[in-house]
Amino acid sequence: MGEVLARSSRLVLLLGVLVAAVSALAAPGVASARVTPLPAPYRVVVVDRMSDAAFAAVARRGAVGLMRPGFGPTTSYGSALAELVRGAEVNSHIGGMPPGKPLIGPDKVRGSWVATWCRMCIVLQLPPRGGTLLNDKLYRVAIVGRGYHGLLVSPTTHIPGLVSIVDIAPTALGRPSTGLSWVGASNAVGHLDSLGQQIHANNRLKYAALFIAAALLLLLALLGLRAAATAVPAALLVNLGLGAAQVSNEIVLVAGISIGTALLAFALARVCRSDDALLMLYGGVVFLYAATMVSRPEWQAINPFGPTQNSRFWGIGNQVETLLLAPLLAGAVLARRRFGLLGFLLFGLFGLVVMTDNRLGSDGGGAIVLGVALAVLGWRLFRLRLSGFIGLLGAAAVTVLWLVQRGLAQQGPDHLRSAFSGGVSGFLASLASRWPLSYLPALHAWMLVAPLLLVLVAVFVAAWRRTEVQATRDLLLALGVGLGVSLLVNDSAAYELAGGIAVVGAVARFVPTAAPVRLRVRVPLFRRAEPVASESPPS
């Protein structure tokens, strides 16, 4: 008995250390390799083209990067120019002018010769004049003066070499807190060529990668293999490995997501045979993503499940958010069964910090989804009354709001600033934007969204009917509610549905082996009364 208690206390301590470590990762820090220039005004020059020779020449004199000219699936010369001069964005699904007045007045020059001799200048390309274009091309940008040399580093993208168009105006005005900095590079042009190929290849495979993962996890679940319970962590680990290896070959990417995930899932299933091992696997994968988002955000961002690099550049996108629901919710179930209420609360807090904090996931929609799912899960696991569910939901909301306000208090870009910095009006405007950003695109893509929705419902019903394990049903219910909320608050329905198929298939084979600990503290106000067995009178 003493050995069991000591082991339990060590695992509780490990959960506490995990939460503390993630909180430390989320604390503001300074990247010593990045160099911030002194404030100074720059001349901004828009060229109609920039040849390879001119780009190589300016790279020897300054710092260079690749620039995304807009936000959303489409762009144009007019919208890119409007965002350039204002240093503000507007999603192409919404349209119209970005907020604010023009801050800079760029010069327009034909040819790229100006880049070879200018001083104190920012030279960049924009999309060609004409109609609307797909926002799938990166354009060259260079800065000369004030010691700039190497790769441009953007506070908006968090990816060395990748620049957003909203970074140009604050840089030109000499605002170091929101402008571009740089990091040294021996072959900046070669690095940018590789970066562009990597972004292009991974963006082409966003749907394919999720469909492959969903099919693989469904197959493992249908075959009744325990590897289904470790397949989502395996897919997330392979995805992160492909990002760290900076793979740009599409054949290798597909092979990694399919064959690599299957092999790793079977290997993890052999190693993680106990609930404690699964708990450490689920928590370890999430912690690894958190550490990567702080130390090497480009590894987590540029991979098959990463953001699309045309509206969200870093943090947790809808694909990874949906896949993370499996280890976060299943881990919360195991933490509750192993350590009771304390374990559930610590693991839930750990997940909310990773999902919400601005230096980590910075995913407001994901925070809402996870908070609601955790409240439903706790309500079911602890057999609470409705008041208990409301209490858990309120606790999750307070935690998320505290993390959001903590991020808003720091300088620099924040994915959640537009929704929360404007008070009630800003939040209402964010809710109103769900129609053009979420629901209208889903209606336009109904031929893809409708079949995925039908498959997800069928998989969920089959999983629910095939299991009689109460913990699995509790997990399925929380996951189903979370996916429903995700469709309401997020803006990529097809990604969420495909990812949902994958995680429901995995959760269907999740069966805890250890008996849950008994709760020593009872709160009658929140807990449902246990049924009392009646005794029949002796005959």
Labelled PLM ranges:
Residues G29-H200:
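Soluble extramembrane regions of membrane proteins in the secretory/endomembrane system
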Residues V189-A201, E298-T322, G423-M447:
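Juxtamembrane membrane-water interface segments that cap and precede transmembrane helices
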Residues D193-T308, N318-R337:
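Core alpha-helical transmembrane segments of integral membrane proteins
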Residues N203-A215, S248-A265, T308-P327, G364-L374, ...:
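Alpha-helical transmembrane segments of polytopic membrane proteins
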Residues A244-E250, M355-G364, L488-Y495:
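Membrane-interface helix caps and helix-loop-helix hairpins in membrane proteins
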Residues C272-L281, F339-L342, F382-G394, A471:
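Membrane-interfacial entry segments at the cytosolic side of transmembrane helices
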Residues D276-S295, A301-N303, G391-G426:
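Aromatic-rich transmembrane-lumenal/periplasmic boundary elements in polytopic membrane proteins
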Residues G340-L341, A462-L476:
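Membrane-interface helix-loop-helix junctions at transmembrane boundaries of multi-pass membrane enzymes
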